[in-house]
Amino acid sequence: MTLFPAIGLAPLRLLAIVLFAAVVPCVLMTAPAVATQYALQLGLGPARIGQLFSVELAAMSLATLPAYYWQSRWDWRQVARGAALLFIGANLASAFSDQYVTLMALRALSALAGGSLMVVCIASAAQSPQADRVYGLWVSGQLILGAVGLWVLPPLFANYGLKALYLGLAMLMVLCLPLAGAFSAGKASNGRHAVSPPTGQGWLPGLCGLFAVLVFYAGLSAVWTFIGSVAADSAIEPADSGRILSIATLLGIAGSLCATLIGPRWPRNRLLGLGLGLMTAAICLLLDAPSLLRFAGAALLFKFCWTFVLPFILACLADLDRHGRLMNSANLVIGGGLALGPAIAGPVLETGLGMRSVLIGSACCLLLAFTALMITRRCRFLVTTGVHP
């Protein structure tokens, strides 16, 4: 099969990675619209709505744990087909469920299937010799579908309710299902290339890389979750801040596409430093009650750099592990970081330390991420395959 020279993957495999990864987190990417509909249609309060989203995020991340077993034993194409069918079934059932406990169980089942698909996508992207470009498209697909969802879901909800979301997800996955055969068979077909268990210093690059992903997501999620509080404390009108954050979504798409275009053309260390440095600068611009103009500049810069630098961060892990085991762990760490940031920032705000402490802590997280990535890059010569010496 002909390969894309700029990507290094078969066209159908690249398409499968991007499309499956876009559909799987669609509920989380359209959370503002979905949360509003949960309240209007099901009469749920903030606590129960939060629990539904937390269950989806947790189940998607915990799909990593069974993947440690099947990733080296089962054909990834069969796993993708089975997970896609489970995702379709869970969403079809969700469309006709009006009981909270039943809906929560179905959303957990859907997210577990989606998380397994995400593991296949992330690990398959790691097999590309230009993983940074693949991860750029991986991020772009999620952002584009999320933006489209935020645009089309409100009028669909008005006419069809939550069925529009769940039936739509099932339909999209049905359309993606034929692409499951485009994934590689995984390690099951490459047993002769297996390597011995990692020992000694060989773990250091992988551990530092995973730590970098954890603190990166913890720092950005703490800021993005409570960025509305910065606007409120600065007496910025909710309508103005809402428009700014909507535009920021477009900047996020632009950031990931820029990463795809640049790929390996520029030195990765400089790209990591540039992206994380500008994200830190954006956080600093949010300090001390910013004006509307400063808030807008900070929010737009933060979102652009977030999606710009993420593909290069994931590519650092992919360089260490072409078989996908380390990238499987990254799926778990991403979910942990997304949950950890708000979990720490919320109590910090309630104790009276204020948003300034949250912002400074988040900036420190990004600096820690950069330091850990530099250690990973420096130690790369210690490994030959994955994290093995």
Could you tell me what each predicted segment is?
Residues P32, P205-S246, L250-I253:
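Extracytoplasmic gate region of multi-pass secondary transporters
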Residues L62-D98:
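Conserved MFS/SLC helix-loop-helix module at the cytosolic interface between two early adjacent transmembrane helices
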Residues S128, L137-A185:
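Helix-loop-helix hairpin linking two adjacent transmembrane segments in secondary transporters
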Residues P267-I313:
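C-terminal transmembrane helical hairpin of 12-TM major facilitator-type secondary transporters
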Residues G43, F96-V101, P267, D288-P290:
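Helix-breaking motifs and short loop linkers at transmembrane-helix boundaries and internal kinks
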Residues A63-W76, G255-R268, L349-E350:
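Helix-to-loop junctions at the C-terminal end of transmembrane segments
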Residues R322-G354, S362:
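A late C-terminal transmembrane helix in Major Facilitator Superfamily
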Residues A108-G141:
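Cytoplasmic helix-loop-helix junction between adjacent transmembrane helices
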